[in-house]
Amino acid sequence: VGIREATIAGQGIGMALRGLRPLAEIQYLDYLAYAIQILSDDLACLRYRTKAGQKAPLIVSTRGHRLEGIWHSGSPMQFILGALRGMLVLVPRNMTQAAGFYNLLLQCDDPALVIEPLNGYRLKEKLPENLGDFTIPVGVPEILDEGTDVTLVTYGSCVRVAQDAMKQLQQCGISVELIDVQSL
């Protein structure tokens, strides 16, 4: 496969339509724009167009959403959410959560976009003993911290940023509830 995002997506869709479970990687979130038309027109609406007669369980993996380099400074999340109605859009806060999403996606027939946290690749994480089996449910926010003064709702790479802000607020006597929505 060449380094042409539309080709990567198109070949992944073709493989998925033939019964395989491909995982197509788009190097950075900003590059997804080059594949958005084929993902929107050919994948996201496939079940709707065929009255659930066809499925293409393609998993598109990318990284980004925050802390990108000078050439990857955008965050096209609103654009992505609007264009990919019909696909799961998952934004794990760390790589353990990402593994849970991938495990789930390998068991279901929904196409999905997983946006891995670029600021989490080199972090040490506590791993579950069943790393190859555990799943993270889609559409279920997780309350990471209980609080009484402020509720902070975030996702993906911004969870770590929010946790740092919480520490500063706690020093001022402000109790913060932190919710990770995980899927958009």
Which ranges hold each PLM region?
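Short beta->alpha junction loops
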Residues: G2-R4, I179-L184
